[in-house]
UniProtKB/Swiss-Prot annotation:
Name the record gives this protein: Thymidylate kinase
Species per Swiss-Prot/TrEMBL record: Neisseria meningitidis serogroup B (strain ATCC BAA-335 / MC58)
Top EC group: transferase
UniProt keyword annotation of Magnesium present: no
NCBIfam families: DTMP_kinase
Residue sites binding ATP per the record: 10-17
Gene responsible for this protein: tmk
Gene3D superfamilies: P-loop containing nucleotide triphosphate hydrolases
Function: Phosphorylation of dTMP to form dTDP in both de novo and salvage pathways of dTTP synthesis.
EC number(s) stated in the UniProt entry for this protein: 2.7.4.9
Catalyzed reaction equations: dTMP + ATP = dTDP + ADP
Length: 206
């Protein structure tokens, strides 16, 4: 099997941070070479843009915000993702372009056609081989976000914003079931872990 590009995504409060550890442990047990990274971020340029994008004091317009996301992504692809895949290393990214369709598209209202143009220009033919989409009901997401001490620029949004974000994620997953695995993360940790491991086992033929 060629090196796989895997993404982990979902609305805020879906449990990405917790379940990244599950994915890391899965790769470690099998001794597979893997690189973990994140968006926005993953490179010095990307991390600098991340600071701007997540800062509650940032007053960026929708187009500027979307362009910053894709600027960070282009640097990420060229500097991290493609070199790792070329070296035979699997890549797992905490968020990728699905998040832009969901947050800037669904949440903010950026036309999907405009995002698709940027996606094609920045990524060419690069798409994830597998996307693990963690999903929780809106009320669970909002409750978990509410427990966050310091909320970033997106976490400060209201429930209707996250309702639209979640809707786009689920619509994209339904339209491309061969790439997405929707994981119900509104369960206990062991059940979620077992679901993720089952998906990875099936994808890698373990």
């Amino acid at each position: 099997m060629k090196p796989q590009f895997i993404t982990l995504d979902g609305i805020d409060g879906a449990g990405k941070s917790t379940n990244l550890a599950v994915i890391k442990a899965w790769f470690e047990r099998r001794g597979l070479p893997v690189l973990f990274t994140r968006e926005p971020g993953g490179t010095p340029v990307g991390e600098a843009l991340r600071e701007i994008l997540l800062n509650p004091e940032t007053k960026a317009g929708l187009r500027a915000e979307t362009l910053m996301m894709f600027a960070a992504r282009m640097q990420h692809i060229e500097e991290v993702i493609l070199p790792a895949l070329s070296d035979g290393i699997h890549v797992v990214s905490d968020r990728f372009t699905d998040a832009t369709f969901a947050y800037q598209g669904g949440g903010r209202g950026m036309p999907s056609e405009d995002i698709e143009i940027l996606e094609h220009w920045v990524q060419g033919g690069l798409k994830p081989d597998l996307t693990l989409l963690l999903d929780v009901p809106l009320e669970v997401s909002m409750a978990r976000i509410g427990q966050t001490r310091e909320k970033d620029r997106f976490e400060q949004e209201q429930a209707d914003f996250f309702m639209r974000v979640r809707g786009v994620y689920l619509d994209r997953a339904a339209a491309c079931p061969e790439r997405y695995a929707v994981i119900d993360s509104n369960r206990n940790l062991d059940e979620v872990r077992n679901s993720i491991e089952k998906v990875l086992d099936g994808h890698f033929g373990c």
